[in-house]
Regions:
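Active-site anion-handling motifs in enzyme catalytic cores
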Residues: 1-393, 398, 403, 408-470
Length: 471
């Protein structure tokens, strides 16, 4: 019987929303990176065409009727998370704890992380430690282990009183295992001003970083900026300056694309993403990915593009270290070093080192939590084939036929092949995903009306909030 999963995400990988719906409904959960790890997890667990993955938003509370329906309808509740151990997420984490406690089905956390400064210091006290501890206890009553993003989070779990291997396992980010043990080798890079570079960052980072990225753009004319935050997608789609979509920021950094007058807006060199396939397709057109966003750079790695991260905090750093993604930190960045000198001796193939072993750890985590995957099914199929035809030629042929989701080896091509024998890939291949979002003034004429409609609705709501605050 096919499995039925409830999964914490705002959008299914098979959804193809209009720009209007994507921005209005915040399908990226405030950050496009949140699309990537559910996408990968669903691919792994979709063992047949009838496997069900229903998205759920966990921001609010659930009625008794909703809880009864979930318990009766699903085999497990999948909770792929990012930097959930942070103070600004504690309210939703408490909501999640309450939800998990009321469920009778399995509840599995895949890839949770701790957000702190670059030192990863967890020796100080945390006022919200009890909230985090309660969440972990609730989850461990419904699962075998909790999957962590990296070693800094492991230290935090130790601080909370949990034990490695017994209560948790470091598995990295599920997004890195989109193709299983296979990972595309980064395409060769010849550093020069003539390459095409894709840059990712965010507004609330030190000015020295924005200055450095401005220098990168000056040095490499063929550049694109790829924002990930919801407030930037709103600014792109509507033409409303970032100062309106992020009123909590008292000042805007110099050089950052904050409004339609910025050269990146005017020259149509900004792209936003609300589906993973359109994101990867766009990244494949570049030569280099560069910036501060962990999933923006993981997406490039999955697209077979060399990626380099400037880590601003522990949540990014621990994943870069675990998955051996080339990186430096904001603290270590020397503004006087050109991007060409910075990257001159970087080994972009380091992401391949140990990837198979990391995947096997991830696969074991899925096994420990009784989550059957396409990789388990494939292993069973391979064993059956070997029993029927006990020849090395037959085994090699079967391995090649299923290369897109083989459980062994690293791919040596730039773009991994997908296979229609994989239910997820087959379903994705049938969808004509919309291209990336472009700045307001460059939208197709057919999209302008909806963009204008959203613009005036957004401004009206902001105006009403301002009046109510003054009252």
């Amino acid at each position: 019987m096919s499995k039925r999963y409830l999964i914490r995400t705002n959008i299914s990988p098979f959804d193809n929303p209009t720009y209007y719906d994507a921005v209005r409904k915040n399908v990226v959960r405030s950050n496009s990176g949140n699309l990537l790890f559910p996408h990968s997890l669903i691919r792994a667990l979709m063992t047949d065409d009838d496997t069900v993955f229903d998205p759920v938003n966990t921001h609010g509370s659930f009625s008794d009727e909703e809880i009864d329906r979930i318990n009766a309808s699903y085999d497990a509740f999948l909770i792929p998370l990012a930097n959930a151990f942070r103070i600004s997420f504690m309210e939703e984490l408490a909501n999640l704890t309450a939800l998990v406690r009321r469920l009778t089905i399995s509840c599995i956390v895949v890839g949770i992380g701790f957000q702190g400064n670059l030192s990863g210091d967890i020796s100080r006290g945390f006022k919200w430690a009890d909230t985090a501890r309660d969440f972990c206890k609730a989850v461990l009553e419904k699962s075998a282990k909790i999957g962590l993003r990296g070693e800094t989070t492991a230290k935090f779990m130790d601080y909370l009183g949990f034990q490695r291997d017994k209560d948790y396992q470091v598995i990295g980010c599920p997004s890195m295992f989109l193709y299983g043990a296979d990972l595309p080798a980064p395409k060769p890079l010849s550093l020069s001003p003539d390459i095409r570079i894709h840059i990712n960052s965010k507004v609330d980072l030190p000015q020295k970083l924005h200055d450095y990225l401005k220098g990168v753009c000056d040095a490499i004319p063929d550049h694109y900026y790829l924002p990930q935050n919801q407030y930037e997608l709103v600014a792109m789609y509507t033409g409303i300056p970032l100062s309106y979509t992020r009123p909590d920021l008292k000042t805007m950094p110099a050089h950052y694309p904050t409004d339609p007058s910025h050269p990146l807006f005017r020259q149509n060199r900004i792209r936003g993403f609300v589906t993973v396939p359109s994101w990867l397709d766009f990244l494949r057109q570049g030569d280099l990915n560069f910036g501060t966003r962990i999933h923006g750079n993981i997406a490039a790695i999955l697209a077979g593009i060399p990626a380099f991260i400037i880590a601003p905090d522990s949540r990014v750093l621990e994943l870069a270290e675990y998955h051996r993604i080339p990186h430096t930190t904001v603290a270590d960045l020397d503004e006087k070093t050109s991007v060409f000198d910075l990257l001159e001796n970087v080994d972009f193939n380091s992401v391949l080192d140990g990837h198979k072993e990391r995947f096997e750890t991830y696969l074991q985590f899925l096994c420990d939590n009784d989550l059957p995957s396409i990789y388990h099914a494939m292993d069973a199929s391979a064993k059956s084939a070997n029993n029927e035809e006990d020849t090395s030629h037959s085994a090699t042929t079967n391995h090649k036929d299923d290369a897109s989701h083989s459980a062994t080896g690293n791919r040596q091509e730039n773009t991994p092949t997908t296979s229609t024998s994989c239910p997820f890939d087959k379903k994705i291949s049938e969808i004509d995903f919309r291209p990336p979002l472009v700045p307001y003034r460059h939208l197709a004429a057919s999209d302008h009306f909806d963009a204008m409609r959203f613009r005036y609705t957004f401004l009206a709501k902001r105006m009403i909030k301002g009046v109510l605050r003054k009252a």
